[in-house]
Amino acid sequence: MFTIKQQLSLDTTHEVLVVGMFEKNQPLDGIIAECDRRLGGQVSVLLKEGDISAKKKQISKVHTLNQAGVKRLYFVGLGKEEELTFDLLREAFGKLFKTLKQAKRTEAAIALDTFVTKDIDANDAAHALSEAYYLATYEFPGYKQKKNEPEKRIESITIYTEADQAEIEASVFVGSVYGKATNSARTLVNTPSNLLTAADLANYAVELANKYEFEYEILEKDDMEKLGMGAFLAVNQGSKNPPKMIVLKYQGKETWENVIGLVGKGVTFDTGGYSLKPRESMVDMKTDMAGAAAVLGAMEIIGELRPEQNVVAVIPATDNMISGEAFKPDDVITSMSGKTIEVKNTDAEGRLILADAITYAKHHGASYLIDVATLTGGVIVALGVHTTGAMTNNEALFEQVLEASAETGEFIWRLPITEKDKERVRSSKIADLNNSPGREGHAIMGGAFLGEFAEDTPWVHLDIAGTSVTSKEHDLGPSGATGVMVRTLATLVERFE
């Protein structure tokens, strides 16, 4: 897919040559000046007339009309050099690859060094490029009858750079791994729930474990009953599909200590139970396992890159259905931790299955906990659809998660958990906890509830209800599942201190 070369010449035969262009007042230089000379000054003229733009994420195409071996020049606007960030560069590459895909180009050459600044070196640019390629060109395969005519797509990208070839190849590999794993998560989330049950999710995890030599454990219903996972089992009561508690373990150190626990909500479809969702809210509830997908995507990256860390991934997988056996408002259930819970809302089921998953992650030695869940509609009201809500009991761990999210462009914002919030989730008159104390501060109530099970273990909760799916196409992908938090979790593990 990617080939690294050093000597760039306009006489080289390519369908497309891609060049980065910054906004600046000085005369054209480097490869852009060479393009201008070959085309008899046309680049300068088109820049002056606005047909070529160096503004952020503007893509301009110029045909060379046989004045060079390269057929077409694509200029990628990058804005002011001092304002270019890794995230903006990744988006610019994403827009480029979408443009090339729409134009049905099958190969391209990229002058990588034209995308480099004093803050973004060639390795960063190579990572951004390869990651953006996979993210931007992703398509969910779907289930329509296939057309006989194969669709044209980019099959070859040649990267020209004067940087160390081995280092660039390594950066391209890492970016590709990040992009592919995010797409794996997207596909899981986009898959209809009749084709992705808890058993299917468990089978996927086992395949991942076998590929990357993870230790794994799949708890069946009988196992959960013996362990006292009453919160998880309550949610599954109404379903004909048995629950699965999925555990993957990666050991990158000699001893099993300082273990990072990744916990992902795996509700494969959520009707709301007897606290039934309205029709409009039930559509797309196949995506209620996006937290599980994020954790599995992160484990794919971990399996490929083999960081020197210890990681345990725990995923409670079930659907939340209605039947004569389903759990009900006013039920009292006992979690694996021994804490009792009064159910006031069967549509607040995610926190119930996560409660037992968090306890089980601690049972497997998790020293730090990060849970990821499409937990509440309240977080969408609070933060919208571009920012993930976060809550924590540990400043140092949160800062590491925050740094990882900033690096990957998956932005988070911290919400508080006060003593008053804790009192509200402990407000039941007949049980230790209340799973839904009220609508006020609903996102915080979900986090505060989970904090009761994290207890003193350093913990960060990530509510991705607003960010796991997008209704609009964007520079780094189509509408549908985003694969949010795959890259943040993997980056956190890689950089963890």
UniProtKB/Swiss-Prot annotation:
Keywords: Aminopeptidase, Cytoplasm, Hydrolase, Manganese, Metal-binding, Protease
Chain residues that bind Mn(2+) 2: 265, 270, 288, 349
Protein transport listed as a keyword: no
Keyword Repeat: no
Chain sites annotated for binding Mn(2+) 1: 270, 347, 349
Cofactor: Mn(2+)
Biological process, per Gene Ontology: proteolysis
Family listed: Belongs to the peptidase M17 family.
Name of the protein in its database record: Probable cytosol aminopeptidase
Lineage of origin: Bacteria, Bacillati, Bacillota, Bacilli, Bacillales
